[in-house]
């Protein structure tokens, strides 16, 4: 299979971000592509009038929790009130105005293609059910991208 990089994929990821926000009662979502050690924003779903990452790229090694999600292939959640919150991720949450974060790897073509980040304005933590629902939504999106 050739790697999908076309408009169809971007549309699929935008629709997936919308579905994720509704599915786990999040306030916002970003979907980023991992290229080497850089995360590049592909699409976002944010409250009206809010821009999240504005096309910025982030160096994965600067964000240990992000790196752990991508290397392990397992989702991770944090809130600003967590005693062991990743300081780099906490800084981004504060900058964006959010209190809770759920990160999930996005697999396309049998490998980690990107990262999905879900945000909540309130400090209501994402839980195992949220991770499961988000994982199911991403699995369907991955299957459609691979199809």
Write out the residue ranges for each language-model feature:
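Short hydrophobic/aromatic beta-strand element in the GNAT-like acyltransferase core
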Residues: 28, 90, 103, 115
């Amino acid at each position: 299979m050739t790697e999908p990089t076309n408009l169809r994929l971007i549309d699929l990821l935008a629709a997936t971000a919308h579905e994720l926000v509704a599915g786990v009662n999040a306030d916002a979502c970003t979907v980023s592509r991992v290229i080497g050690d850089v995360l590049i924003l592909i699409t976002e779903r944010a409250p009206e009038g809010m821009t999240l990452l504005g096309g910025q790229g982030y160096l994965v090694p600067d964000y240990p929790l992000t790196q752990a999600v991508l290397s392990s292939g397992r989702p991770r959640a944090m809130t600003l009130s967590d005693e062991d919150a990743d300081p780099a991720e906490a800084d981004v949450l504060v900058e964006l105005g959010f209190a809770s974060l759920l990160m999930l790897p996005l697999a396309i073509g049998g490998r980690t293609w990107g990262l999905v980040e879900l945000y909540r304005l309130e400090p209501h933590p994402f839980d195992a059910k949220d991770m499961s629902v988000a994982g199911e939504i991403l699995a369907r999106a991955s299957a459609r991208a691979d199809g």
